[in-house]
């Protein structure tokens, strides 16, 4: 692995009086799979939203592939120009827990829209890219379907295909199975496993403890807006920290 694909330094985020992210620093290397675990309200999703610039940080630095997206100046968090942010956006994709597909678009249109509007590629190239992804994810026969005609697992696979269509360097997953019935969870986890085998760099917020243990190079435990512990799966699952052990044990026994 070479260099850091993602670098976060001293990230801070508040909503009103509530300090949600408290001085978090995190780096992710090429090909690394990092899972983020922790109780609800610990700041996991906000961390992802700030890292992907859906939310603006109140302090800290953010860079992708050595390219600065935000930095601190005179005590304030300053973002690079809109044009630079748009270019940096091409480095990453985000898969939401509630799919976020356009309901009035077909599966194919959902996938080709961003490559054409964001990356500026031709419709022909976008469709070729989409067809390849649909075949890879077992959805070729659903290309003309609309989201309401799909199961939750199929919708989430389409949202993964949509994120991959921009050919990102990093994929973020925000609890990708939390909106799915248990029997549909496996088909989405299978896709993420396949991406890990292809050395896709991924940051995954998840409550699937066994999955995180099997797949991750590193696991981060967050609580109350801070990283309480990070390390290999074995280090986390055999943690000397009683709170980490309690959380993992409780979630795995649900």
Task: Show where each model-derived region lies.
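A short, proline-enriched helix->beta-strand linker immediately N-terminal to the Walker B motif
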Residues: 165-169
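Catalytic Walker B motif of ABC-type/P-loop ATPase nucleotide-binding domains
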Residues: 171-174
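ABC ATPase "signature
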Residues: 230-231
């Amino acid at each position: 692995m070479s260099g850091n694909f993602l670098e976060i330094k001293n990230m801070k985020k508040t909503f009103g009086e509530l300090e949600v992210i408290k001085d978090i620093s995190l780096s992710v290397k090429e090909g690394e799979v990092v899972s983020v675990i922790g109780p609800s309200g610990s700041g996991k999703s906000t961390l992802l939203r700030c890292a992907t610039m859906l939310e603006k940080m109140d302090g800290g630095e953010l860079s992708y592939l050595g390219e600065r997206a935000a930095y601190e100046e005179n005590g304030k968090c300053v973002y690079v120009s809109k044009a630079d942010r748009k270019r940096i956006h091409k480095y990453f994709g985000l898969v939401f827990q509630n799919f976020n597909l356009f309901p009035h678009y077909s599966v194919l249109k959902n996938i080709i829209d961003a490559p054409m509007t964001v990356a500026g590629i031709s419709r022909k190239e976008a469709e070729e890219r989409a067809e390849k992804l649909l075949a890879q994810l077992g959805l070729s026969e659903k290309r003309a379907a609309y989201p309401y005609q799909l199961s939750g697992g199929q919708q989430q696979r389409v949202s993964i295909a949509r994120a991959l269509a921009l050919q990102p360097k990093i994929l973020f997953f925000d609890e990708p199975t939390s909106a799915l019935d248990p029997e549909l969870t496996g088909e989405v986890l299978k896709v993420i496993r396949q991406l890990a085998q292809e050395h896709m760099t991924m940051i995954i917020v998840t409550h699937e403890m066994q999955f995180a243990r099997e797949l991750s190079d590193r696991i981060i435990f967050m609580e109350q807006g801070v990283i309480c512990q990070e390390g290999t799966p074995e280090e986390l699952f055999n943690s000397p920290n009683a709170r980490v052990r309690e959380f993992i044990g409780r979630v795995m026994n649900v």
